């Protein structure tokens, strides 16, 4: 029997059980990105990090794997943009040190104490409004913020808010990975 990579390239959102049992692997590139981000976070305890890729290339898996590692000792916040709502409820129930928020919760400040988290992770960051991004960039001055998004050329015109993407790319000191 040949090895079938597609059996191990999973989405934590659609297959939370397999994710929680660690029935997946990261590619060499994903492991390298994760290593660089975690090394910098351990050294500086702050910073902006942004990785992009084509849809289906494991960005969400990488982001969740980083969240799992960072949440070993401290609470982290995972912000979901878009329609990921119901899927992450299973993960939310199981991962006690990972708090899940929808983007609109950040905008309204609805009972959120962002300072309670040691790191902020943002999935589908290309869907962020410029207002929410500004709030997250301010938070990033005192703790790490990790953004994951689709490549610019893969974002539909309805989803693309160039203001937010441009603002993110212009952040001094942001580490980007493609």
Annotate each PLM feature:
Residues 1-12:
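Interdomain "pre-motor" coupling segment immediately N-terminal to P-loop NTPase/helicase cores
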Residues 16-28, 34-57, 61-119, 124-178:
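Conserved helicase motor core of SF1/SF2 NTP-dependent helicases
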């Amino acid at each position: 029997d040949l090895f079938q990579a597609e059996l191990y390239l999973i989405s934590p959102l659609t297959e939370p059980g397999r994710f929680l049992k660690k029935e997946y692997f990261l590619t060499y590139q994903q492991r390298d990105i994760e290593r660089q981000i975690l090394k910098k976070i351990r050294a500086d305890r702050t910073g902006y990090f942004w990785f992009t890729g084509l849809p289906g290339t494991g960005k969400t898996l990488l982001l969740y794997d980083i969240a799992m590692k960072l949440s070993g000792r401290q609470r982290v916040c995972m912000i979901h943009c878009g329609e990921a709502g119901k899927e992450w409820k299973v993960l939310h129930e199981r991962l006690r040190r990972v708090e899940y928020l929808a983007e609109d919760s950040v905008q309204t400040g609805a009972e959120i104490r962002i300072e309670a988290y040691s790191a902020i992770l943002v999935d589908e960051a290309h869907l962020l409004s410029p207002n929410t991004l500004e709030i997250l960039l301010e938070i990033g001055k005192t703790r790490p913020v990790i953004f994951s998004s689709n490549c610019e050329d893969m974002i539909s015109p309805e989803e693309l808010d160039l203001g937010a993407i441009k603002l993110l790319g212009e952040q001094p000191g942001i580490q980007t990975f493609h």
